[in-house]
Amino acid sequence: MSLEVIFGSNILLILVAYFIGSINFSIIVSKIFKKSDIREKGSKNAGATNMARNFGFKIGFLVFFLDVSKSFWFAIISAILRDFVPFFGAVITQLVVLFVIIGHVFPIYFKFKGGKGAATNLGMIASLNIILAIIGGIIFFAMIFRWKIVSLGSFITPFILVIFMIIPWMNSSIIAYVGYSDFYQPVRESFQGAWYLSSLFLFLAALIILFTHIPNIKKLIKKEESVLKFSKKSKKLA
């Protein structure tokens, strides 16, 4: 396989990933169903937590589900293309899915002002190993139960999961399909499946999420960060 094909296939999917990631469901849902821009309310963040705080748990969960889905399904589709379409045989799935997160944080459709990437990162994690996603959920909710601060769990949990991903079973088991065959055959044989790739790109994703939470970290230091509190009013989509 030529270098042109290797770079071309990865760049093509990176661009597609970025444009898909740029579809910010918080902004779209708030404008369509609530006739307002979520970026002008509450924390002004275009994410599921701010949606839940301002419009209720149900609509917040809808956005959360959609954000998780866009990275999860893009990872699955890109892995299928990698394994069954020769042109995409050298695609690094974890790399291209990282750009779904980047698109979510810096959406081209919304003046590069998007969400913080936590839910989209969860979709990437779930695609790599659903058990890892469950572990992440347990850690996240344990932190929420203890401190009732969503941002704290959002930027700490990804770094903890990077450590878990180093465990061989997490990145090379039968349910770790997306990360199992990272490169085309000659490279897979030389690097034994490039086991480190999933951990590497999860770490990069964690750094992005840490960056987006810098304002929250400053508030935490000043003890001004918001505690978990959803709207008690009954909210409907229409």
UniProtKB/Swiss-Prot annotation:
It catalyses: an acyl phosphate + sn-glycerol 3-phosphate = a 1-acyl-sn-glycero-3-phosphate + phosphate. It is an enzyme of class 2 (transferase). Keywords: Cell membrane, Lipid biosynthesis, Lipid metabolism, Membrane, Phospholipid biosynthesis, Phospholipid metabolism, Transferase, Transmembrane, Transmembrane helix. Its EC number is 2.3.1.275. It holds the Pfam family G3P_acyltransf. SMART domains: G3P_acyltransf (SM01207). Pathway: Lipid metabolism; phospholipid metabolism. One of its GO terms (cellular component) is plasma membrane. GO terms for molecular function: acyl-phosphate glycerol-3-phosphate acyltransferase activity. It comes from the Bacteria. It is found in: Cell membrane. Its main location: membrane. The keyword Lipid biosynthesis applies. The keyword Transmembrane helix applies. It is a multi-pass membrane protein. Disulfide bonds: none annotated. One of its GO terms (biological process) is phospholipid biosynthetic process. Belongs to the PlsY family. Probably interacts with PlsX. Catalyzes the transfer of an acyl group from acyl-phosphate (acyl-PO(4)) to glycerol-3-phosphate (G3P) to form lysophosphatidic acid (LPA). This enzyme utilizes acyl-phosphate as fatty acyl donor, but not acyl-CoA or acyl-ACP. This is Glycerol-3-phosphate acyltransferase. It comes from Mycoplasma mobile (strain ATCC 43663 / 163K / NCTC 11711) (Mesomycoplasma mobile).
